[in-house]
Amino acid sequence: SLTGKAGLSGTSVTLNGTLGLSGTGEKSIQSLSGSGTLALNGGTLSVTSASARNGSFSGTLDGEGRIDVSGSGNQVMQTGSSTYDLGVHGGGTLVLKGTSAAPALDYRNVAVGSAGTLRIEAIGHDAGDSNTSLNVGSIDFQSGSTTEFVYNLSASDPFGSAMLTADSITIGNGAGFSLANMEGNTGLGTYDNLDGVVLMTADTIDGLTEGESMSVGTSGLFAVYYKDATMSREGNHIVLNATVQQDNIFTPAVNSHNSGAGSELLWEAKNNLDATSQLGQAMHSISTMITGD
């Protein structure tokens, strides 16, 4: 427990016991890992680094507080608390990822600021792994922010429920959104157009009027299977719409007879690929390099 003028500055923390921060000293670290207990006692912990740092915390958030992520780091939170706030901005990446025991994460307020990336990521890539469900009081997607929804396309019903539920959602002008899949996903099997798939839901939505839509970026298998992805407001829901990709997207890269045959083989097999097969591995490698509008 650090009280008085004691504090933390410029270190990576692996927390497997209990850390209480209640003093007036600086509370700034490069990354947070472990499965212990963090008690901020109403204060703010800054997670920031000028170099690439990765942290993953799955412990307990005790009391009240705020965690603020910035810089070049990648901070994963596999736990939550309805009395904690989150912020990400200034180059930082915040990954919210549930577990099989707790696929839903709760937070009080979340702010995704300029040059910050929020990633809501499924708990895994296997058939029995669900998407992460984020529940918050409020979330503010500010101008210049990026939010990525990472689905497990191996799940039996990957689009069956919203990935974000909030009391209020604010979408700033210039906020960006994108869709991605988990590494290890190799296909969707049978699939149709995405038509009114609920992505987010809230009692109050500001920044997106009824019926208004905005484009959503795609990467990986979403770019393979779909085109013209958008999200629009329908009442208290923000829903996804996208059209099935009919044309072989690998064709523009063909520069020989062999590569042409390979592109046709991969395209025709895209609905039923074993992750351990050579085609499955090829699809994984190629799809991770694909982005779409």
Regions found by a protein language model. Give the residues of each.
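Short, exposed beta-strand/loop patches in secreted or surface proteins that constitute
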Residues: 12, 37-38, 86, 110-111, ...
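GD-rich hexapeptide-repeat beta-solenoids
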Residues: 21-59, 73
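Extracellular beta-strand/loop-rich repeat segments of large surface/secreted proteins
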Residues: 46-53, 63-71, 79, 83-85, ...
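Tandem-repeat/low-complexity and Cys-motif detector
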Residues: 11, 36-39, 59-62, 83-85, ...
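Glycine-centered positions in the ABC transporter ATPase nucleotide-binding domain
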Residues: 1, 17-19, 43, 73, ...
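Outer-membrane translocation/initiation segment of Type V secreted surface proteins
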Residues: 178-293
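Short loop/beta submotifs within extracellular cysteine-rich repeat domains
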Residues: 2, 7-8, 22, 75-78, ...
